[in-house]
Amino acid sequence: MATASQLPVRIEDTLYTCIEPDRLIEHDPVSVAINMNTKEEKKLPFDYPDYPGSEVKLKRYGMEASYSRCYDGQRFIYSFHYDENIYVATPEHDSIRKVSVKSKYFDKVQLPDELTASPEDFCVNAWYNNLLYDPYREVYYRIAYPPSTLDKGVRPMELVQFGRKNFSIIILDKDFRILGEPLFPDNTYNPTIMLVRPEGLYISDSHYLNPRFNDDILSFRKFELVEE
């Protein structure tokens, strides 16, 4: 399995990629290393973390696969949407460090019930999202969704596709210390579409509830880090 938030990484002759969770086995590895010369595969020693409800194997939604992974040139960093911690791994995953990266806007993740969840739950419950590495400023950006509300007339599945109603970005330094966490205005930006460039971080403002939204144009706003 490889998605835009879990891109394969090639280091010399080895390709590191992610694999789908298997709920029915005891040890459920997240990643696999593939030797590009011999085509041999090796599952890496890092399992999908447990979370409230993960013991239920037959379910409507599978939260295990909700995560992102980035590579900073030395380490892989995993951000599971249901976990306040991030996981920092060496390429071979023989060393895994768990680091608390908790939002200041909510105390704990509010997971939808795996069997009875409704689309609205995915719009209003608090949890985390993707993590990006910024090599130009040597910082990391972790998206967090605080508890929210669903406005009258808003279709929940459409809102989810555009990054929900609001969000914050937890900014981490190269040692994973929190530098700040700005909260962004309602219905303005789409945090699922972000670009890191030498001049700054670009976040799409093509949110369908933004008054300036144009279905024919994908637009961005540039943000720069400023020391306080």
Which residues does each predicted region cover?
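Beta-propeller blade signature
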Residues: 25-40, 84, 88, 156-177, ...
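Structural signature of eukaryotic scaffold interfaces centered on beta-propeller domains
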Residues: 1-12, 59-73, 79, 124-137, ...
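Loop-centered beta-sheet repeat module
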Residues: 24-93
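Coil residues (strongly favoring Ser/Thr
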Residues: 13-14, 29, 95, 114
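Surface-exposed loop and turn segments in beta-propeller and other repeat-based domains
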Residues: 1, 41-62, 97-123, 182-188, ...
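Hydrophobic beta-strand positions that form the internal "hydrophobic ladder"
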Residues: 15, 76, 140-142, 201
